[in-house]
Amino acid sequence: MSVKMQRRLFTVQEYHLMSEAGIFGENDRVELIEGEILEMAAISPRHASCVKRLIGQFRQIPEELAILGVQDPIQLTEKTEPQPDVVLLHPRADYYATAHPIPSEVLLLVEVSDSTVDFDRDVKVPNYARSGIREVWLWILRKTV
């Protein structure tokens, strides 16, 4: 007789409580995806460079039109809170100090991908679409020859 093991999925609230309790170290790079706490890939120099270039372009947009977010959490559902590379958000007077943005507040979301293309394309982008984010760019960094 075999027993099927059940995974314990976490909510965003539980995830935040774990963080506040110090379960994650200051340098831990994790995000909550579909109830699972996943370690994020290390940021390569090419990835960081691409994000910086995007910031340089988007920084020119006046803040009364959009707030620029970089690797900040977006609460998609009760069990999913990814940290996309770049987002443009609807302006808010408090700059989202009281709560992380939700899908209806996202104007544009960009994921830069080099080592996690399959996961970003097959898991993250569909999650963004299901949550109602209207504009998502998956920026795939090609390997140079």
Model-inferred region functions:
Residues M1-V145:
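Gly/Pro/Ser/Thr-rich low-complexity, intrinsically disordered segments predominantly at protein N-termini
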